[in-house]
Amino acid sequence: MFQFHAGSWESWCCCCLIPADRPWDRGQHWQLEMADTRSVHETRFEAAVKVIQSLPKNGSFQPTNEMMLKFYSFYKQATEGPCKLSRPGFWDPIGRYKWDAWSSLGDMTKEEAMIAYVEEMKKIIETMPMTEKVEELLRVIGPFYEIVEDKKSGRSSDITSVRLEKISKCLEDLGNVLTSTPNAKTVNGKAESSDSGAESEEEEAQEEVKGAEQSDNDKKMMKKSADHKNLEVIVTNGYDKDGFVQDIQNDIHASSSLNGRSTEEVKPIDENLGQTGKSAVCIHQDINDDHVEDVTGIQHLTSDSDSEVYCDSMEQFGQEESLDSFTSNNGPFQYYLGGHSSQPMENSGFREDIQVPPGNGNIGNMQVVAVEGKGEVKHGGEDGRNNSGAPHREKRGGETDEFSNVRRGRGHRMQHLSEGTKGRQVGSGGDGERWGSDRGSRGSLNEQIALVLMRLQEDMQNVLQRLQKLETLTALQAKSSTSTLQTAPQPTSQRPSWWPFEMSPGVLTFAIIWPFIAQWLVYLYYQRRRRKLN
C-alpha cells in the first residue's frame, strides 16, 4: 500500500516535469492518471476504515449487524479480493455469517469494493458524531451533496421568495399601524392616549351602533341630535298624576370628543317642563360614548374614580350614555331655575313619560337640592343611597351632594322609573346593573349573615362538645390508671421495724448458713469416697 503511494508520488513528479503533450509519453501519462484515480479511491477507503475503527463500543452511534456485515464484506473484498476460504463449521455461527456476506460479493474487484465501502459510509456519515477521523473523511470525500443542492435550488428559491414577500407585507402593515396618528381622548382639557387593540374594537362597535358621524355644521348637528340624542324628561309621582308641562330651557354643550375624531358643540336644546310637585325628576339623555357634556355653572365632569360602583368592561363600551339620573325614594326635591334660589319649585304631579321636543330660549344653572335629606341624586356610574340625615360626602371640587355632577358613565342606557314604588332605586350606573330595594337587599344580606353566624355557632358548639367529651374521657382514664396503681398489692416487707439492715432477716440467715451447709456436703462426699476405696 505504501509502495503504491510512493509510486503515485513519483508519477505525479514525473507528470510535473515531463510535458504531457509529447506523443512518446502518452501511454505513460495514461498509466499515471489511472494510478492517481486509484489512489483517490484508496485514500477515501482508508479514511472510511479509520472512521469505522475509531467508533467507540458504547458511543452514541451504534451500527446495526447488517451494516457491519456489509462493511466487513466490502473491506475483505477490497483488501484480499474474492473469498477463497472454506465455510466455517456449525460451531462458529458468526464466522458463517461473515463468510456468507463476503462470498456474496463474488468476483467484485478491489476498486469497486472500495467505492462501495465509501458509498455506504456516505449514507451514515450524517448520523455519526463529528470527530477528527470524520473530518478527515469529509475533507477527502469533498462536497458530495452539491448535486442534490443544485436540483432543489430553484424550488427553495421560490419558497424563500414567497416567504420574503409575506414577511415584507406584514412589516408594511405594522409600519402603517405604528405611523398612524394615535387616538386621543380629551376629558376636562386633559388628553389620554388610547390603547390600540381595545380602542380599535371599541371604535368598530361604536361605528355599528351610531348611525353616521356628526358634522361640524350646527344645523346638521341639531338634526342628528333629534334622532340619536333625545333628551327625555321622565317624571314619576307616587301621589298625583295630574299636571301640565311648562317650558324649561336647558343649555347643554358638548365639550369634547373622547375618541379624538372631532370636537363639537351642541346647540342649546329647549325643553318644556310642567308644573312641579312632590315627585322625582329624571333627566335622561341618550348620547354616544364618544362625547361628554358639561353643564354650565356648578356642574362639572367627574372621573370614574369618584363613583363607588363602576365598570370598564369591554362588552359595555358600545352602549349609549345618559347624562344624569335624579331619583327620590320618598322625599321631595326643590329646583332653583336661573340661579335664583328664592324661587323654588316643589314637586307636583306629572305624567310618567314625557318626550320634550326642542324649543327656544335658554336657562341658567339648574340646581337640585335634596330637602330634608331624603332625596337622592345619582350620576353616571354612582349608586345613590338614602342617607336620611347622614352627612353629605364631599366631592372633588369641595362641593357636597346637594349639587349634581355630570360624569361620564360607560355603557348605560335610558332607564324609565315606575310610579309609586317606595325605596326603589334606578340609576344610570356605569356597570350596567340596577340595584333593587335598598331595604330588601340589606334585609337579605342580613339574613344571610345571620344564617352563616348561626351555622358557625352550631359548629363551634359541636366542637366544644367533642372537646368536653375528650377531656372527660382522658380524666377518667387518668383516674382509673391511678386507682389501679394504688390498689395493686404492694410487697409486704418482711423486715421488722427494729431491723437495722436493708436486707430481710431470712436472707441474712441464709447467707450465713449457706457456707456451713456447703462444707458439710463436701465432707459427706469425701467420706463416702474413702469408704469406697477401703
Curated annotation (Swiss-Prot):
What organism is recorded for this protein? Homo sapiens
Where primarily located? membrane
Name of protein? Acyl-CoA-binding domain-containing protein 5
Q: Tell me where in this chain the PTM Phosphothreonine is found.
A: 400
Any one GO BP annotation for this protein = fatty acid catabolic process
The N6-acetyllysine modification is found at: 469
Assigned keywords, A-Z = Acetylation, Autophagy, Coiled coil, Leukodystrophy, Lipid-binding, Membrane, Peroxisome, Phosphoprotein, Transmembrane, Transmembrane helix, Transport
Tell me which stretches of the chain form a coiled coil: 190-219, 447-476
Where it sits in the cell: the answer is: Peroxisome membrane
Q: How does it sit in the membrane?
A: Single-pass membrane protein
Question: Which Gene3D superfamilies does its entry note?
Answer: 1.20.80.10
User: Quick one: which gene encodes this?
Assistant: ACBD5
Q: Which parts of the chain span the membrane according to its record?
A: 506-526
This entry's Gene Ontology molecular function terms read: fatty-acyl-CoA binding
Q: Which PROSITE patterns match?
A: ACB_1 (PS00880), ACB_2 (PS51228)
- Out of the domains of life, which is the source? Eukaryota
Query: What cellular-component terms does GO give this entry?
Result: cytoplasm; cytosol; membrane; nucleoplasm; peroxisomal membrane; peroxisome
Residue intervals of the ACB domain: 41-130
The UniProt annotation places an acyl-CoA binding at 52-61, 72-76, 98, 117
Annotated region (Disordered) at: 181-225, 376-442
